[in-house]
Amino acid sequence: MKLLPEKKNLTVVVNDIRNAVWLEDHTDFNVYILGGLVRRGYHYTTLPTRNEFLGMINIDKGFFSCNGFSVERGITAPDFETAKSVREILDVCCASYLMSDSSKLGTVTFAQIADLGYVNGLIVDTEIEKEDFDSIVAMTDIILAE
């Protein structure tokens, strides 16, 4: 996110309250926050009212994170509500990118968001093992972040 202030004329949609505040403080973007229930301790919204909003928009490029991902089980979240919420956002993205550090590779949590091949790319640190890189690049593009 820290590279975003270099961009101009963006409209950003987030469900994370802290990200919305950071974007408000550091950019001149139009920032929309998806409404709904604030998940206690995690500072993001989920469920009811945002569904209507999501049905009305198209997101050019969506960036999201997860609790774990693997070639076999895909992208996962700690609970069903979070997985469903992220999947609904992905469904309105023209292109979507998973941002994760390599330490989450091989971690599988409770609920699947999507298969790795469902996203257009994985943005990951350079610590990813070559064997893992080769397995994942067969499913989706990989962008190495320094």
List each model region and its residues.
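Conserved phosphate- and dinucleotide-binding cores of soluble alpha/beta proteins
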Residues: I17-E146
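Active-site catalytic pocket residues across diverse enzymes, especially alpha/beta-hydrolases
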Residues: L3-K8, L23, T27
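Short active-site oxyanion
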Residues: E6-V12, V119-G121
